[in-house]
Amino acid sequence: MPPSRDQRKVLTSAPTSPAVAAAEFTEAGVLLAITYSIREGRRGEFFDLMRELKPLLHSIGGSDVSVYEDRSRPNYLMEVFRFKDEAEFTAFDDKFHKDRKIAAIYALLDDIVEAEKSDFKIFERRL
């Protein structure tokens, strides 16, 4: 239960700097988001493959990549790539489709995810 009005402390001044550094979103001009719905019991395999992929993706220009999980849907994950501009994204995309090892790992992921619940989107910064 929150404190009563009499027990609340009054702040005399606002903090001069934020406690947490805010992300600089102006750095990303293109975002690639790939969503995955992981089959029951295959979560460990998914993360093993993603750990194997990360250095390979980094080597072809995918240096800003993260994996997020939906808070309300277990085993529903999103891999997010951030690129500074269209040229950086295009260079990555060209190398991505030519790399046989990356293709082999994504082929293994196909068996782990439910394709009908997985998707990818490309977003461009507007503001």
Show which residues each predicted segment covers.
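Generic structural motif
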Residues: 39-41, 86, 125
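A compositional/biophysical signature of low hydrophobicity enriched in polar/charged and small residues
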Residues: 2-22, 29, 125
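Short helix-capping and inter-helix turn/linker motifs at the boundaries of alpha-helical repeat units
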Residues: 24-25, 67
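Short, surface-exposed ligand-recognition loops at beta-strand->loop->(often short) alpha-helix junctions
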Residues: 37-48
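Short, low-order "capping/linker" segments at domain edges
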Residues: 119-127
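An amphipathic, aromatic/His-enriched active-site/gating alpha helix that lines ligand/cofactor pockets
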Residues: 2-11, 54-64, 82-118
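Short, well-ordered beta-strand segments in beta-rich or mixed alpha/beta enzyme
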Residues: 30-37, 66-95
